[in-house]
Curated annotation (Swiss-Prot):
Gene encoding the protein: Cmas
Motif BC2 motif per UniProt: ranges: 198-204
GO molecular function, one term: N-acylneuraminate cytidylyltransferase activity
Protein name, entry field: N-acylneuraminate cytidylyltransferase
Entry text on domains: The BC2 (basic cluster 2) motif is necessary and sufficient for the nuclear localization and contains the catalytic active site. The localization in the nucleus is however not required for the enzyme activity.
BP GO terms, sorted: CMP-N-acetylneuraminate biosynthetic process; glycosylation; N-acetylneuraminate metabolic process
Omega-N-methylarginine PTM positions: R35, R50
Source lineage: Eukaryota, Metazoa, Chordata, Craniata, Vertebrata
Annotated family: Belongs to the CMP-NeuNAc synthase family.
Stretches the record annotates as Disordered: 1-38
Enzyme superclass (EC): transferase
Pathway named in the protein's UniProt entry: Amino-sugar metabolism; N-acetylneuraminate metabolism
Entry annotated with the keyword Nucleotidyltransferase: yes
Record organism: Rattus norvegicus (Rat)
Length: 432
């Protein structure tokens, strides 16, 4: 997360759930306020994503649960429907390409605002200098993958309808704080927010509000005065399970599990997967073919993948295999996977479509694991798609999930686990 030290106007604590006022002088409302006939103020979402992250190199586009990190917040911002424009400010070509793939516009960040010492405020001011049409900036942190559109919708309403100059996200925590011991200065610690003689139970204490770094919304005139927080300001309290911030490597596996359970996966409701189609060469196998002395072909697969297929079938998901190559019957029978298989397929999409209709399924109920250009159309068409880590670049660009495992090295088992987690989300949403 970019430094924010320059961007806050100091103010005293506010009562719980109440707005607080910052130090800047009384601010003029943005043009058009209170005039129903004038064009509403331009609210722009801005994600700052420079390429020089020190904690995790290029972390903004590192895959989290199969999706580039920045993709989670871009999806939420675009689907919120409250922004006139959604931008990514970056100095890196790869980040720019990913941002455009998700539908965001790109502001090329200057070298001056891409330094380790540069602050978020520096980059936002630069963005505003190039975009006079923008009246309000919603600075969304790329490192907060559990952000939901509903959070952004409510904050936009607070800014537009309730007249706040700035709104920032917080999370409620129940943590007791103690002063730091410093040799030669303070030899003992002191409680900062509790009486040790009367330690409250969690349920008897409201806790405290902490910034969680997910977003900072502010009006243009406030930012131009040098503040991200000030004027008539308020906090927006996010749910604890949605308050995820990734800074170092140790945060990554925790965030991955959290986003799979609590992340936002798009507007369309998840469907229960009923059919998984898997390409044989490069997905089930590693793509290598060995030929014995008697001219028989030999292929291998990972036992973990066989177990993954078995678990899918036990959960009621049909698993079928497909290949454009003419695999021999002896080779297929030797796999002992008991899956319907189609080989020498010139049009994989037509074959999968035929299977789908045969089972009475919609495309959203079909999953596909592929790795080649010939799989591209299937990957784009199905409800859930994935590729192994070593898939070709065109296949990778067509999917929503890229496995950590390579083909023939556990990719099917990994994708199966991903499917099970999504099915859990489907079941939970149905219960709600």
């Amino acid at each position: 997360m970019d430094a924010l030290e320059k961007g806050a106007a100091t103010s005293g604590p506010a009562p719980r759930g109440r707005p607080s006022r910052g130090r800047p002088p009384k601010l003029q409302r943005s043009r058009g306020a209170g005039r129903g006939l004038e064009k509403p103020p331009h609210l722009a979402a801005l994600v700052l994503a420079r390429g020089g992250s020190k904690g995790i190199p290029l972390k903004n586009i590192k895959r989290l649960a199969g999706v580039p990190l920045i993709g989670w917040v871009l999806r939420a911002a675009l689907d919120a429907g409250v922004f006139q424009s959604v931008w990514v400010s970056t100095d890196h070509d790869e980040i720019e390409n990913v941002a455009k793939q998700f539908g965001a516009q790109v502001h090329r960040r200057s070298s001056e605002t891409s330094k380790d010492s540069s602050t978020s405020l520096d980059a936002i001011v630069e963005f505003l200098n190039y975009h006079n049409e923008v009246d309000i900036v919603g600075n969304i942190q790329a490192t907060s993958p559990c952000l939901h559109p509903t959070d952004l919708q409510k904050v936009a309403e607070m800014i537009r309808e309730e007249g706040y100059d700035s709104v920032f996200s917080v999370v409620r925590r129940h943590q007791f704080r103690w002063s730091e011991i410093q040799k030669g200065v303070r030899e003992v610690t002191e409680p900062l927010n509790l009486n040790p003689a009367k330690r409250p139970r969690r349920q008897d204490w409201d806790g405290e509000l902490y910034e969680n770094g997910s977003f900072y919304f502010a009006k243009r005139h406030l930012i131009e005065m040098g503040y991200l927080q000030g004027g008539k300001m308020a906090y927006y309290e996010m749910r604890a399970e949605h308050s995820v911030d990734i800074d170092v490597d140790i945060d990554w596996p925790i965030a991955e599990q959290r986003v799979l359970r609590f992340g936002y996966f798009g507007k369309e409701k998840l469907k229960e997967i009923k059919l998984l189609v898997c390409n044989i060469d490069g997905c089930l196998t590693n793509g290598h073919i060995y030929v014995s002395g008697d001219q028989k072909e030999i292929i291998s697969y990972d036992v973990k993948d066989a177990i993954g297929i078995s678990l899918l079938k036990k959960s009621g998901i049909e698993v079928r295999l497909i290949s454009e190559r003419a695999c021999s019957k002896q080779t297929l029978s030797a796999l002992k996977l008991d899956c319907k298989t189609e080989v020498s397929v010139s049009d994989k999409l037509a074959t999968v479509d035929e299977w789908r209709k045969e089972m009475g399924l919609c495309w959203k109920e079909v999953a596909y694991l592929g790795n080649e250009v010939s799989d591209e159309e299937c990957l784009k068409r199905v409800g859930l798609s994935a590729v192994p880590a070593d898939a070709c670049s065109r296949a990778q660009k067509a999917v929503g999930y890229i496995c950590k495992c390579s083909g023939g090295r556990g990719a099917i088992r990994e994708f199966a686990e991903h499917i099970f987690l999504l099915l859990e989300k489907v079941n939970n949403s149905c219960q709600k």
